[in-house]
Amino acid sequence: MNTGTYLMPTAAYIHIPFCRQRCFYCDFPIAVTGFQSLTLDGWVGEYVEAVCREIAGQQHQGQPLQTVFFGGGTPSLLPITGLEKILLAVDQYLGIAPDAEISIEIDPGTFDQVQLQGYKNLGINRFSLGVQAFQDNLLALCGRHHRRRDIDQALTAIAKENIENWSLDLITGLPEQTAADWHSSLTLALAAGPKHISCYDLVLEPQTVFDKWEQRGKLAVPPPERSADFYRHGQEVLTQAGFHHYEISNYGRPGHQCRHNQIYWRNLPYYGLGMGATSYIDGKRFGRPRTRNGYYQWLESWLNQGCPIPGERVSPLENLLESLMLGLRLTAGVTWAQLPSVNQTEKAKILATLTSFGDRRWLEFYGEDNQMLAPNQTTTETVQRFCFTDPEGILYSNQILSALFAALEEDF
């Protein structure tokens, strides 16, 4: 790998694809295991070894990683010895900073207190619990394998193990989900005591079970206006409870924002490792095949070629658009300094487009000393930062971003 002088990644996402079954909304690259306990014998161990070989091929020459994230799939299905092997490889070849955030996704019904203790012994210090909903009927409709009793057992294990830094995931806009269901899930989530809560709006991904049902008219998802009300209610309940709404879907207690995901939102480089994972290195985004056999073939070819960084560099315009799209997910918004090589013409186009929405109160602009600017004060010289209003601007963010992208792309 030719490391050159580009900025090396300080984060690594590691994909653990194993799942007991595929949820009806899921289009992630997974490997369905059924309900048997996994061991490192056979294909599970083969996958772990493949990921370790990919890690060894990175030839990292930068600073130790600041964040490591085990996502999936269901990482809590992988035996702890498998996680240990991967973490040892990460530390050996990429380095892990002493104060690194090391996260793992865990699902109810796939771990106990002993397992949590094992994770802590490995240095894992942040846990993301995939609850999604507290109502058994909604969980069943989504094809989730767990139920409310599994959630309660998971929360008990977390409490007994004195896990302090953990997050709880919820989904809004589920089939047959009512306002009462959503309020109950928020209330129960707060009572569980996480330091971080993620609220994701359901997206009907192509070729998923939900997508096929929707095309046949068999899926009763809430209409967009009700989903918007769910979003407003979640924002109100969680912020009133003391959570900081720092990203479109994410809320954290002070000091508990997810450090790893902020790498993505700031459009900074990162390693993606394992089946279906995507990397952003040296200005290049590239993914791996989404099946195990495809990934293994790709890995052998990549190793035989000397571990190059594949793909073409993102163009300056693409980089600018990605930085805007990702950065504006953060409620703090974007500063000019965070936009790569933005010129005066582009600044003027960005401001002209954004201020055209100003009378709808969907955006805010800030100058020096973080002072909010009135609409007639917004110039390329006075504006230092801009963001969506919360929650209304966020709800219309797709419309605003579409107009922004059209304005910036018209000369290309």
From Swiss-Prot:
Disruption phenotype: Cells lacking this gene have no detectable phenotype. [2Fe-2S] cluster binds at residues 19, 23, 26. S-adenosyl-L-methionine 1 binds at residues 13, 72, 105. Keywords: 2Fe-2S, Chaperone, Cytoplasm, Heme, Iron, Iron-sulfur, Metal-binding, S-adenosyl-L-methionine. Residues 4-241 form the Radical SAM core domain. Induction: Induced under microoxic conditions. S-adenosyl-L-methionine 2 binds at residues 73-74, 132, 144, 169. Its main location: cytoplasm. The keyword Lipoprotein does not apply. GO terms for biological process: porphyrin-containing compound biosynthetic process. SMART domains: Elp3. It comes from the Bacteria. One of its GO terms (cellular component) is cytoplasm. InterPro entries: Coproporphyrinogen-III_oxidase, Elp3/MiaA/NifB-like_rSAM, HemW-like, rSAM, rSAM_horseshoe. GO terms for molecular function: 2 iron, 2 sulfur cluster binding; 4 iron, 4 sulfur cluster binding; coproporphyrinogen oxidase activity; metal ion binding. Its cofactor is [4Fe-4S] cluster. It is found in: Cytoplasm. Probably acts as a heme chaperone, transferring heme to an unknown acceptor. Binds one molecule of heme per monomer, possibly covalently. Binds 1 [2Fe-2S] cluster. Although this protein has sequence motifs typically found in proteins binding the [4Fe-4S]-AdoMet radical-SAM cluster and S-adenosylmethionine, spectroscopic evidence suggests that a [2Fe-2S] cluster is present; S-adenosylmethionine was not detected. Has no detectable coproporphyrinogen-III oxidase activity. PANTHER family: COPROPORPHYRINIGEN III OXIDASE, RADICAL S-ADENOSYL METHIONINE DOMAIN-CONTAINING PROTEIN 1, MITOCHONDRIAL. Might carry two S-adenosyl-L-methionine binding sites with only one binding to the iron-sulfur cluster. Belongs to the anaerobic coproporphyrinogen-III oxidase family. HemW subfamily. This is Heme chaperone HemW. It comes from Synechocystis sp. (strain ATCC 27184 / PCC 6803 / Kazusa).
